[in-house]
């Protein structure tokens, strides 16, 4: 028995070795291989048919699983409906019956699909493994057939022929050929038949699935219609308890856009080619001022502004005002720009919103109000200041011209490069405010203070962004020129006593190194004069006169500060426009200056009820609603209190155009809303 098993095992091993050897020879090309291309095509079709059947079986199983899931979901849905259904409601038993029948239909549909389609598909795919094994066995028998054939050919072609071995090889060859032919013939007939039967199988399978699904949907539609009728009758019995979906809340009316419109951006004005290098042109129209923040409106020392572009190319320490010292006196120096370079003074909201209350005098005369300075007076350079049309106070031009120009040269004459260089060399660097008073006056020893701009409170009104050469230049006049100026004033004019007093005070202030520090330390109860300055910004547009409007309230407040100084108590303003050095004689005031000032004061009294202040329009604004004003650039609007706090908080103001008020005197008809950031304050 053991010998038999050993013989079978050895025989199988020998077959495997022969097959391996034959395959190696065929791969190396040393032995030919029997090929049947027709059969190979049958094999490829068989593999494709098997893959398609396997996928169809997988998808059908997934479909049946989904049907089972739908059955469970439908059953749970009907159970939940039966639980919430009240006993006294119509159709309680019908709802229960519909749920039970739906579950039966789902179960029947699933079972018929399993029996009619899935089992048939499993039977169809069950024949593929056997055929696949027979194809593999035929391949092995083909190798045995080729091996026996090659062995027989080798013996027959040998020189020394052994008949016994040749006859034995012939028997093995015939045996291998017979076995191979049996497998080959069966597969040659079976594979094409299997490939052709696939069409009928697909037809029967999907016809069965579609018919079962159509029957199921038809039967379950009857149950769904029955349930729909029950729910309809239940709703008719409880019509007063109908459920309605509430929509969005109704609109109460048009809402105003809370955000105020943004003003249009204007291009920077073109520089003038004839501008003097020691002058700075003001912008044609300042940028709109945004609403102040609470931190900017409270009293106290000014908040230091954020870093900004200075008029000069190089940022120097002398160009920055030190707001954190005890005296709050700005120190300003000049950096002369290059030839044919015009620097534009940009209006920053941080400087406009600064509160200059700390610069007011400590001692104010009784019955006089503090002079208010307009924002423009804090931002424009001194060389753009012009004389007020109300009253003209003569001034000495020598205090401005002695420092940088000869006596026979006007201030506005074009300077040469040589004069510019001399100016830079002649300008000393002033120390910071925290240095002792003796060191602060050392670079300017022997220089006197001028009439127009040497008052410490006027220096506070000069913006840090403007050229400060004017404050240094005013120290060039001597005490003798101040005495000559006092003598030149007319004796019969009401301004003479006041002017003389101002000159005496200027001379006394010049004798001390730090005028304001000495005043604060001594605590002398002497009265200070804060002249009101009217400024006319330069315009880059031809034919356009963009002039600062001086309001009546500002005129009255400014003149009340000056009135106690003179014997006649006249209202007057100091002229800050410099005059040439050779015109030392005083210029008398115009005949109608006092009348113009008085008429402005009378017009200020005829203002709308609740008048707050005036604003000037910087940009055109077209009204979008009937309660808004249509404004053009340059219009003056009289601001009155707003009826709605929401509009005021959103940046809207209420007012009436000054032209409409002067013409109609009807506030209720002509007032309207307008954006605050399109305007600037005039008072």
From Swiss-Prot:
Its main location: membrane. Residues 539-559 have a biased composition (Basic and acidic residues). The modification Phosphoserine is found at residues 252, 262, 268, 272, 276, 496, 626. GO terms for cellular component: axon terminus; cytoskeleton; extrinsic component of synaptic vesicle membrane; glutamatergic synapse; leading edge membrane; photoreceptor ribbon synapse; plasma membrane; postsynaptic endocytic zone. Keywords: Coiled coil, Cytoplasm, Cytoplasmic vesicle, Cytoskeleton, Membrane, Phosphoprotein, SH3 domain, Synapse. GO terms for biological process: learning; positive regulation of endocytosis; synaptic vesicle endocytosis. Residues 261-274 have a biased composition (Pro residues). Residues 24-240 form the BAR domain. PANTHER family: AMPHIPHYSIN. This is Amphiphysin.
């Amino acid at each position: 028995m053991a010998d038999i098993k050993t013989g079978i095992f050895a025989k199988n091993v020998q077959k495997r070795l022969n097959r391996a050897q034959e395959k190696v020879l065929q791969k190396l090309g040393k032995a030919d291989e029997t090929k049947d291309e027709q059969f190979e095509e049958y094999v490829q079709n068989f593999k494709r048919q098997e893959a398609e059947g396997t996928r169809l079986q997988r998808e059908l199983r997934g479909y049946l699983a989904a049907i089972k899931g739908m059955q469970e979901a439908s059953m749970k849905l009907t159970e939940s409906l039966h639980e919430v259904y009240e006993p006294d409601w119509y159709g309680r038993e019908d709802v229960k019956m519909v749920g039970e029948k739906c579950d039966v239909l789902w179960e029947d549909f699933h079972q018929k699909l399993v029996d009619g389609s899935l089992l048939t598909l499993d039977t169809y795919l069950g024949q593929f493994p056997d055929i696949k094994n027979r194809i593999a066995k035929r391949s092995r028998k083909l190798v045995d057939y080729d091996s026996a054939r090659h062995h027989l050919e080798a013996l027959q072609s040998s020189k020394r022929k052994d008949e016994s071995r040749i006859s034995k090889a012939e028997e093995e060859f015939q045996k291998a050929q017979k076995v191979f032919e049996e497998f080959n013939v069966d597969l040659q007939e079976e594979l094409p038949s299997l490939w052709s039967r696939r069409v009928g199988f697909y037809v029967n399978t999907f016809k069965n699935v579609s018919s079962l699904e159509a029957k199921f949907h038809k039967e379950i539609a009857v149950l769904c219609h029955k349930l729909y009728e029950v729910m309809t009758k239940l709703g008719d019995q409880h019509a007063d308890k109908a459920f309605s979906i509430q929509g969005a809340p109704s609109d109460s009316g048009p809402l105003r856009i809370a955000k105020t419109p943004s003003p249009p951006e204007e291009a920077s004005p073109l520089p003038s080619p004839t501008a003097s290098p020691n002058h700075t042109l003001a912008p044609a129209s300042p940028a709109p001022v945004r609403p102040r923040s609470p931190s900017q409106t409270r009293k106290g020392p000014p908040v230091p502004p954020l870093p900004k572009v200075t008029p000069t190319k190089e940022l120097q320490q002398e160009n920055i005002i030190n707001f954190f010292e005890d005296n709050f006196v700005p120190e300003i120096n000049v950096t002369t720009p290059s030839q044919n370079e015009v620097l534009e003074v940009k209006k920053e909201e941080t400087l406009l919103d600064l509160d200059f209350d700390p610069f007011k005098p400590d001692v104010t005369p009784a019955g006089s109000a503090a002079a208010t300075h307009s924002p423009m007076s804090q931002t424009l350079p001194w060389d753009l200041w012009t004389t007020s049309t109300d009253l003209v106070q003569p001034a000495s031009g020598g205090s401005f011209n002695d420092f940088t120009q000869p006596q026979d040269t006007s201030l506005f004459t074009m300077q040469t490069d040589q004069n510019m260089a001399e100016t830079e060399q002649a300008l000393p660097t002033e120390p910071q405010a925290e240095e002792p008073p003796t060191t602060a006056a050392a670079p300017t020893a022997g220089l006197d203070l001028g009439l127009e701009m040497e008052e410490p409170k006027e220096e506070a009104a000069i913006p840090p962004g403007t050229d400060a050469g004017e404050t240094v230049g005013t120290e060039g006049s001597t005490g003798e020129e101040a005495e000559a100026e006092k003598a030149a004033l007319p004796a019969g004019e009401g301004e003479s006593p006041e002017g003389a007093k101002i000159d005496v005070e200027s001379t006394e202030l010049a004798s001390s190194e730090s005028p304001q520090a000495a005043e604060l330390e001594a605590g002398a109860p002497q009265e200070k004069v804060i002249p009101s300055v009217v400024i006319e910004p330069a315009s880059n547009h031809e034919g356009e006169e963009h002039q600062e409007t001086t309001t009546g309230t500002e005129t009255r407040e400014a003149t009340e500060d000056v009135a106690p100084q003179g014997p006649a108590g006249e209202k007057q303003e100091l002229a800050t426009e410099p005059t040439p050095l050779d015109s030392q004689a005083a210029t008398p005031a115009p005949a109608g200056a006092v009348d113009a000032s008085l008429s402005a004061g009378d017009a200020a009294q005829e203002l709308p009820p609740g008048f707050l202040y005036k604003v000037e329009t910087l940009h055109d604004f077209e009204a979008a609603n009937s309660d808004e004003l249509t404004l053009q650039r340059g219009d003056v609007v009289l601001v009155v209190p707003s009826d709605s706090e929401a509009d005021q908080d959103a940046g809207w103001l209420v007012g009436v155009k000054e032209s409409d008020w002067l013409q109609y005197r009807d506030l209720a008809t002509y007032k309207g809303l307008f954006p605050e950031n399109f305007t600037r304050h005039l008072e």
